[in-house]
Amino acid sequence: MNIQKKDVLEALRKITAPGEGKNMVDSGAVQNIVVFGDEVVVDVVINNPSLQAKKRTEVEVMKAIHGEVHEKAKVVVNVKVIAPEVPEIKGKPIPGIQNIIAVASGKGGVGKSTVTANLAAALAKMGFKVGLLDADVYGPSIPMMFDVADNRPQSVAINGKSFIQPIENYGVKILSIGFFTNANQAVIWRGPMASKALNQLIFESYWGELDFLLIDLPPGTGDIHLSIMQALPITGAVVVSTPQRIALADARRGVAMFKQENINVPVLGIVENMAYFTPEELPNNKYYIFGKEGAKNLAADLNVPFLGEIPLVQGIREASDEGRPTVLQDGTPQANAFRTLAQEVVKSVVERNETLPPSEAIRITNTAGCSSN
């Protein structure tokens, strides 16, 4: 048996490490290879601390060497986990919460909730403590996307007072109106009733320590948006749009709402969802079904950051239906896109907190419009 190190390297170039877009060699995951007779020792470094990722790495390396080099090679895989550094986030905390990010869209149907769910899961994978408040009162979909639709939050006693304890999955703490309503019935509430329910979720819940609380807002601009901004000091807003002109017109209005002088919530950036269609069997083919770079051009026109583009692929829909955010499927184009989005959001939050004062909740009056509190 004559095993060559170069053949082992070539075999490992055909697989990827969990969470990396490049192959295992070019990404730097393979640290060392030792070949002695029929024995091959491979030292690998990964960033994903989960036991599943470590086991998968071992199996993939062995499979690659046995399949491409020699089926009877004695393979030893040493996997070391080095978790990525968590960037320092400086924000104004409210009980335990460092940064509150509102995710909005001027128009329904652009994938705002899907983007929010994957952004939350991506931030959790990066090592942040993340909460997600589903404020889309009339169409709460976050519980289904996290496979917790059948769960019911329990109460927890903190300093002698009872609080709602969020449901947790994939490292994300979740609260939604959907946990407290019948899934087969429509939520028919007037604005004040919906706002009251949200206030209970916000102030009668125990989130613990969080780096980020993401809020999945309803589409458009209205009572719920104002109630949230009255209740909480929003660190910044992320606006989701497709490249389509009709969606961009509504996204422009959404940005304008946050930029109103007496609301003045910093816009962290715009995300272009469904940027292009890519068949999973032809990942290099791009079809711009809804137009090309519309949200990117809108961001430039409005002088706000462009946070990235998310492709339209079948895997995103399937992952949402299965209750497992697609960003958790390491190595796929859509997972890489959401991971890049999370990195850009963190970058934008850090820059915002270094250059702007802490946010304050706003106060709405009937006679004076919106004024800072």
Protein language model regions, located:
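Conserved catalytic-core segment of NTP-binding enzymes
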Residues: 54, 59, 211-212, 218-318
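C-terminal boundary of histidine-terminating zinc-finger modules
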Residues: 322-332
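A short, charged, Gly/Pro-tolerant segment at domain boundaries
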Residues: 344, 354-373
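Switch II (G3) loop of P-loop NTPases
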Residues: 153-156, 177-192, 201-225
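Phosphate-binding loop that captures ATP/GTP phosphates
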Residues: 123, 128-184, 202
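N-proximal, solvent-exposed amphipathic alpha-helical segments enriched in charged/polar residues
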Residues: 1-31, 63
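Walker A/P-loop phosphate-binding motif and the immediately C-terminal alpha-helix
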Residues: 100-136, 263
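Extreme N-terminal, non-catalytic leader segments
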Residues: 26-29, 36-38, 43-104, 349, ...
